[in-house]
A protein has these predicted regions:
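N-terminal single-pass transmembrane signal-anchor helix
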Residues: 2-35
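A general marker of short, structured functional hotspots
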Residues: 4, 27-30, 43, 75, ...
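A ubiquitous, low-specificity "background" feature that marks scattered single residues
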Residues: 18, 37, 52-55, 143
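Aliphatic-rich helix starts adjacent to a transmembrane/signal segment
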Residues: 31-49
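Amphipathic alpha-helical interaction segments
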Residues: 39-42, 55, 87
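N-terminal alpha-helical signal peptides/signal-anchor transmembrane segments
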Residues: 44-65
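Periplasmic/extracellular, small/polar-rich flexible segments of pilin-like filament-forming proteins
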Residues: 59-151
Length: 151
C-alpha cells in the first residue's frame, strides 16, 4: 500500500520563497524608479506652473496699470506664493514642505524659489523663478520675468 503525501516538501517551499524574493526585488527596483520619475515630474510641473502663473499675473497687472488703475501694490514673495502660485496651500515639494519658497530654491526638498526685486512701484517688479538641481536628473534652471514686459 502506497502512502499518500500531505503538504509540501521542504525543497518545494524553498523554491516558492526564492521565486517570491526574486519577484519582490524586481518590483522594489521598479517602484523606486517610479517614485523618482514622479518626484522629477512634480518639480518640473511646479516650475512650469509658476512661470505660467507669473506671466499671466504680470500681464494682467500691466493691462490694469495701462488702463489707469493706480491702486496696485508692489508684489512681494509671500503674496506671490500665497495668493498666486499656491493659494490653497496644497502644493508640496517632492520631499515634503512647501512647493514654493521665498528666495532661493531648495535642492534638499525640491522646492522652487521665488525672488522679487526691482522697482518700488507696481509694474516695475522683476520676478526670478528658480528650479533647484534635484536628484541627478534635474539641473538647476531659472527664468527672469519683467513686470513691464511679462516675458
Amino acid at each position: 500500500m502506497k502512502r499518500i503525501q500531505k503538504g509540501f516538501t521542504l525543497i518545494e517551499l524553498m523554491i516558492v520563497v526564492a521565486v517570491i524574493a526574486i519577484l519582490s526585488a524586481i518590483a522594489i527596483a521598479a517602484y523606486q524608479q517610479y517614485l523618482k520619475e514622479a518626484q522629477i515630474a512634480k518639480i518640473v510641473s511646479h516650475y512650469d506652473d509658476g512661470i505660467r502663473a507669473m506671466r499671466a499675473e504680470l500681464a494682467k497687472r500691466a493691462a490694469q496699470l495701462s488702463s489707469g488703475r493706480k491702486d496696485l501694490v508692489v508684489l512681494n514673495e509671500t503674496f506671490v506664493i500665497d495668493e498666486i502660485l499656491n493659494p490653497e496651500g496644497r502644493a508640496t515639494a517632492p520631499l515634503g514642505g512647501p512647493a514654493y519658497l521665498p528666495g532661493d530654491a531648495d535642492p534638499e526638498i525640491g522646492a522652487i524659489g521665488i525672488r522679487i526685486t526691482g522697482g518700488n512701484r507696481a509694474g516695475t517688479e522683476v520676478v526670478r523663478i528658480a528650479r533647484p538641481a534635484f536628484l541627478e536628473d534635474v539641473t538647476a534652471e531659472s527664468v527672469v520675468i519683467y513686470a513691464n514686459s511679462a516675458r
